[in-house]
């Protein structure tokens, strides 16, 4: 197993040149794994006096880093769309089954309007991600602009969807059981 890491090998902090991408053997690193509060696992990796194989440097390394960052931003934005859609679907199901005053709460017009507003926001974010994915093979400035716009919109809409879905679920929306 190996790690691919970046490091400054010379030059100033803001300089595109002087960056190197290295392959580091994982056996030479100190790895500490631990559980997080939400039940997931994380690891902390320490690179103490390790030797690495230089894969590329300077302008080439900078371009590789940019490409990786933008590919990751597009992937995370795509994943977030799926998460938003799942939250929306769970909330729709909840509104169809939860009763209050002898009626399902999904029949209340105010809640229907809120869900329609969420659907519009999710569809807009989804379209933005699809545009970014569709222009991935375009010139870099077009690709980077579209991915940045999608990531920005998805971040704002994701926060809105999470807040609204929790609100619409009421107290049960804050529990691990649900």
Per-segment meaning from a language model:
Residues 11-16, 35-39, 67-68:
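Solvent-exposed alpha-helices and their adjacent loops that cap or buttress functional pockets
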Residues 4, 23, 46, 75-76, ...:
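Conserved beta-strand segments that form the floor/walls of ligand-binding pockets within enzyme
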Residues 5, 22, 45, 84, ...:
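Residue-level signal for inorganic ion chemistry
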Residues 1, 18, 25, 41-46, ...:
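A generic structural signal for well-ordered coil/turn residues at beta-strand boundaries
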Residues 1-29:
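A short core secondary-structure module
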Residues 10-18, 53-60, 137-143:
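Short, glycine- and charge-enriched coil/turn segments that flank and shape catalytic ligand pockets
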Residues 25-56:
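Flexible, small-/acidic-enriched active-site or ligand-binding loops
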Residues 58, 67-178:
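Alpha-helical interface subdomain recognition
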């Amino acid at each position: 197993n190996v790690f691919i890491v970046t490091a400054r090998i010379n030059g100033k902090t803001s300089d595109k040149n002087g960056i190197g991408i290295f392959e580091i053997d994982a056996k030479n690193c100190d790895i500490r794994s631990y559980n997080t509060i939400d039940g997931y696992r994380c690891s902390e990796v320490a690179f103490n006096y390790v030797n690495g194989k230089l894969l590329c440097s300077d302008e080439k390394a900078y371009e590789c880093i940019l490409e990786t960052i933008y590919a990751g931003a597009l992937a995370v934005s795509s994943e977030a769309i799926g998460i938003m859609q799942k939250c929306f679907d769970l909330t729709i199901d909840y509104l169809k089954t939860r009763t209050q005053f002898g009626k399902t709460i999904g029949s209340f017009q105010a809640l229907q309007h809120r869900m329609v507003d969420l659907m519009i926001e999710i569809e807009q974010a989804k379209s933005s991600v699809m545009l970014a994915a569709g222009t991935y093979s375009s010139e870099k400035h077009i690709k980077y602009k579209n991915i940045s716009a999608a990531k920005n919109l998805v971040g704002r809409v994701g926060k809105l969807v999470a807040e609204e879905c929790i609100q619409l679920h009421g107290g049960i929306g804050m529990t691990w059981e649900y």
